[in-house]
Amino acid sequence: MKNKTRNIFFLVGLVFVVLMILTFKVSFRELWQQICHAGYWLVAIIGMWVPLYIMNTFTWRTILLGSGECNIPFWKLLKVTISGFALNYATPVGLMGGEPYKIMEIKPYVGVQRASSSTVLFAMMHIFSHFWYWITALVLYLIFMPVNMLMGILLSIVALFCIAGIYFFVKGYKNGMVVKLIRFVSRIPGCRKWGKKFSEKYADDLKKIDGQIADLHKQNKKYFFISFFLEYIGRILQSFEIFFMLMLFADQEPGVMLFVQSLIILAFTSLFANLLFFIPLQLGGREGGFAMVVSNLGMTIQVSMSISIISRVREIFWTSLGLLLMKVGNKNVEVPQHEEYTDS
């Protein structure tokens, strides 16, 4: 990727991070009190994302191996993964920031088609695992928590949403979804001319990318299930972030029930926040989700405020680090001649 292009991504991400910090409606005094209260637990909460990002990187590498050799150094893939998530967190419309950046960064190593298909597949797998994570939380809620009529209706809506999402992604894995996505964009007012021109110009490339997406599910099921397992387990392990915070702020003893509550809180908060994907850093959505879910579990509003503040501190840390990583370790890579992958 040219430094000029990389700098554009960096500046866009930086603008939204600064905007988020300036609109963070917490006084410095309260913020400092929460950080001091968290103490060494804050280090654990921030540090636990190292193995989570490593698992994300292994997922992406597994997907790349499903379509041929992967000659990208692991540290490079890890760096791009962290920076890609940072851009997704920082920019509006989520995936519109990180995914183009990731494609451009690994294109010199694997070619534009494999870079595009693997990045799309990684994004699909990341979202697909979320649907199963939300289903898991829903089942645990039904088993361990009291359910009244209103909550029953809400859980039914969530279940239908998740089932529809899983069905949509399974269809996408079988047949590819890039061509259909471009067609959908072409019907949006203001994007019709661009969508039509783009689909006509890159028709063959888009079909090949869809073919590579379908191949992972049809012909390389081992890589498909390994990548799904890594992402799903990553979502489960992420629940420990809330687990640590509940031990700290709610003064609860560690145990299975506390972990179940942590998983439910994170699942429904992430569902609520992802529905507001168009907001940079999901401003307000995540905090509202914490308040709604935590209060429904019988905890105080102060607990939800403390959790949301520390979560926001962690997000600012990793988003800032991801943006800084965009500026280091960027050596020019000689673009090789890439052969199209065919399964023999």
PLM region spans:
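Membrane-embedded helical hairpins/re-entrant loop segments and their flanking transmembrane helices
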Residues: 57-82, 246-265
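Membrane-interfacial helix-loop connectors
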Residues: 246-309
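Membrane-interface helix starts
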Residues: 5, 37-45, 214-229, 317
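Transmembrane helical segments that form the transport core of multi-pass membrane transport proteins
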Residues: 214-269
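A short amphipathic helical element positioned immediately N-terminal to and/or at the very start
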Residues: 29-35, 205-218
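Short helix-coil transition sites and intra-membrane helix breaks within transmembrane domains
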Residues: 51-58, 62-65, 89-100, 275-288
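Transmembrane helix-loop-helix hairpins in multi-pass inner-membrane proteins
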Residues: 1-33, 87-193, 283-344
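Alpha-helical segments in transporter systems
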Residues: 45-53, 122, 222-234
